[in-house]
């Protein structure tokens, strides 16, 4: 609500994202991309319409059910790395598995495998202050992957990184996509969106353009 007027952040959005797509969602401030990310990530529910994820109608789930979906189906990567400062890379990656009740031996094995996927096998026992910005984001990506989510949802994941490190991180996402991971990227940077094989442009709460890029070929 804005005064007595209802403002709809998204209007008439009809969108299907297929398994193993690498999709970038773009748009200026106020375009609705953050709202769309919150809906896709089950952080919010739509005021009307439906959202289906893996044949499940999640738009009608309660908060507890949405929390279970988020933990099981969605891996989040944010602009800020959100790592525990006193914990090692390995322990930071283990955290979602601790919440899921996974035993310690399996936790360590899966966290180590996840760090290996992002090229940090030699940094497992380092703390965040011993890592570069790019390495910290790799830890965050490994943490997002450790529950083997259906979707990797990245919100401005290179926003705190320089251009060279940003491209290194985007190559990690590209490699994960080529290995079969579905990736949804929220960004306002064209050079970052160019790594995706599909670009969705939002404007004033509507899909303005939805295009496949050359990278999809």
Describe each model-derived feature in a short phrase.
Residues 1-202:
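ABC family nucleotide-binding domain
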Residues 199-212:
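H-loop (His-switch) and adjacent beta-strand-loop-beta switch element
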Residues 214-217:
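ABC ATPase nucleotide-binding domains
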């Amino acid at each position: 609500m804005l005064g007595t007027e209802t403002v709809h952040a998204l209007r008439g959005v009809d969108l299907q994202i297929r398994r193993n797509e690498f999709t970038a969602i773009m748009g200026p401030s106020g375009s609705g991309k953050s709202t769309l990310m919150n809906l896709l990530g089950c952080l919010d529910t739509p005021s009307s319409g439906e959202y289906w994820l893996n044949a499940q109608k999640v738009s009608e789930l309660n908060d507890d059910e949405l929390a279970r979906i988020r933990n099981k189906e969605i891996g989040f990567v944010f602009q800020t790395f959100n790592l525990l400062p006193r914990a090692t890379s390995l322990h930071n990656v283990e955290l979602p598995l601790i919440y899921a009740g996974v035993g310690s031996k399996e936790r360590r094995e899966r966290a180590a495998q996840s760090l290996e996927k992002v090229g940090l096998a030699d940094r497992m026992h380092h703390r965040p202050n011993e890592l570069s910005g790019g390495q910290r984001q790799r830890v965050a990506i490994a943490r997002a992957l450790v529950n083997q989510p259906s979707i990797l949802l990245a919100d401005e994941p290179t926003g705190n990184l320089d251009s060279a490190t940003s491209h290194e991180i985007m190559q990690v996402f590209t490699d994960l996509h080529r290995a079969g991971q579905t990736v949804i990227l929220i960004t306002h940077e064209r050079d970052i969106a160019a790594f995706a094989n599909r670009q969705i442009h939002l404007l004033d709460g509507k899909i303005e353009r939805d295009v496949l890029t050359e990278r999809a070929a």
